[in-house]
Amino acid sequence: MNRLFYLLFISAILFSCDLNKDDKKIEFIPNLTDLNNNEFKLENYEGNVLIVNLWATWCKPCVAEFESLEKFKNKFIGKKIKIVAISNENKDKIKAFIEKRDFDLEFIKLNGDLSYFNAYSLPTTIILDKQGNESFRIASGIDFTSNNFVDKILVLEEL
């Protein structure tokens, strides 16, 4: 019964996502770097569906969804789907967090405020189509392996 409720809840969240494609391109986000201080640009991923996961080490729902995010990533290796996990926390704190948990995702440091993404709660996941336009966003923790989410991403990947 709990599982059914959970699946219905997740489905309701995903169906309520904004699927309006008004070419909501995310403008240049200043000061994005990888954890080795190399400049990172979202534009480098055009031609791929990009899953941008905004998170923090102190955010329990953020941490909880990483396992399903990694499962999703591993299931679709070779597809035109990329994932980046962006946090604005201290780089050393992010590195220590990753080392303890051994996540294999691309972690990016935002040297600024998450409001650049118009994100005001965590976790927030923003899906960009192959042209870099925002397709939809989810402002809560989700199961990235749910059929509903996977189907939406695969439709974008085929376009």
Which residues fall in each region the model found?
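Conserved redox-active cysteine motifs that mediate thiol-disulfide chemistry
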Residues: 54-71
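Active-site acidic short loop of glycosyltransferases
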Residues: 45-48, 78, 104, 119
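Thiol-/selenol-based redox modules, centered on thioredoxin-like
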Residues: 127-159
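Acidic helix N-cap motif at the loop->helix transition within catalytic regions
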Residues: 93-95
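Short, internal strand/loop/helix patches
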Residues: 84, 97-130
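N-terminal "domain-start" segment that seeds a small globular fold
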Residues: 17-42
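Sec-dependent N-terminal signal peptides
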Residues: 4-13
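Short pre-active-site segment immediately N-terminal to redox-active cysteine/selenocysteine motifs
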Residues: 48-50, 54-58, 90, 121
